[in-house]
Amino acid sequence: MKNSRTPIFVTQPYMYIANNYDNFDCMVRAMASGYSHSFGLKLLFGDAAHCFFAEPTHSPCMMLGMATGENSSVCVQDFGIDNCTAADGLAVGRASGFVGGLMRPFMSGCYTLQDERMYTLLAQLADAEALYLEPSALAGMYGPVLTQPGQLLGAYTKTVLPAGALANATHLVWATGGNMVPREEMQRYYAKGKALAQQ
């Protein structure tokens, strides 16, 4: 059983899909996927579960929506951010007000990472595990690194966890996919990640 000495960290990309059919707005929120995982883990394990949204630096809609409290009333372009990212499989410029409002009490925070980091992680994961994921699927993979002392979320873990508990933590990452990416395109992703890792 998880408790404050054996915490669970959950990191996942934010996803929102919206379509417009003849002036009829049809919006599908991603509650059935990653959000339900965080929601369920938080209900099951309480304060032992620490949930984070991971987003590209050029498309941090959930972070901006939650930080301002405006949710879907603001978009990344309102803050001069271009919403151009390789993580276009999941990234969008405007957060869902429904998801933001529902998940805010359950989230420990949000973080962003650059596309270059996602490509590097893509190549590293392929080399280490022979697992080929699309760039957007790698957003959450940086969460376990960021929770370590001296990293972005290190102050958070130091504040909320008892001494030594981080060493016992379980890290769960919602890796959204990659098996539908054409082989040639995946090879380009991989080559780019390898090149970036050598810089």
Language-model-detected regions and their locations in the chain:
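Active-site-adjacent helical/loop segments in soluble small-molecule enzymes
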Residues: 1, 5, 12, 18-21, ...
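Glycine-rich phosphate/pyrophosphate-binding loop at beta-loop-alpha junctions
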Residues: 4-105, 161-199
